[in-house]
Amino acid sequence: MRRSDEIDTPRGPARADVDLPHSEPATLLVLGHGAGGDVDAPDLVALRNAALGAGIGVARVTQPYRVAGRRAPAPAGHLDEAWTAVVGELMRRHRSIPTLVVGGRSSGARVACRTAGALSASGVVALAFPLRPPRAPERSRAAELETGLPTLVVNGDRDPFGVPSAGPRIRVEVRPGERHDLRRDPVGIAEVVVDWLRERGWTA
């Protein structure tokens, strides 16, 4: 079942594209897009398809600034506020789904990391996590990955934003030849994520 809805947030309407498998899922995976991108990025679409095939519900969230037609991203606090409102509403609508996993690509991965604890998520999926700006390598964002939750990071070894280090609760999968867009093998990347979700017991 597929449904697309606008959801009101304190920062304007967002959009949630929700896909549910035929049987009741045990997990809802909520994904956010990159700063200048959208939820139809190849890695997000491939992950949606693979997760659905594994019996996981998937919601891809478009931030209010993109719904309004702007490409320049909103401030981090605004992104977090809108995302939190959308995920909260999705969990209210799908309260029968017991497990929430949040994630996204690039900026969306950062938002998911920053809000995962407050949303009572069980885990985080971070695709193309932008560890540091290419022109400001001293500005590391590694602390955002320290959510205290099981976290999977999938980055390319040619990503100009760098590759995070693994930690006690952070698994890092490095994809050879991939850059920040993760376009070379999105299906393979999706399989890595679903395998990790399966290991955690979050698939059907």
Regions found by a protein language model. Give the residues of each.
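Catalytic histidine-centered segment of alpha/beta-hydrolase-like enzymes
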Residues: E178-A190
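Conserved alpha/beta-hydrolase "acid-adjacent" motif
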Residues: G156, P160-S165
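Short beta-strand immediately N-terminal to the catalytic nucleophile in serine-hydrolase-like folds
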Residues: T99-G104, L127
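Serine-hydrolase catalytic machinery in alpha/beta-hydrolase-like enzymes
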Residues: D5-P98
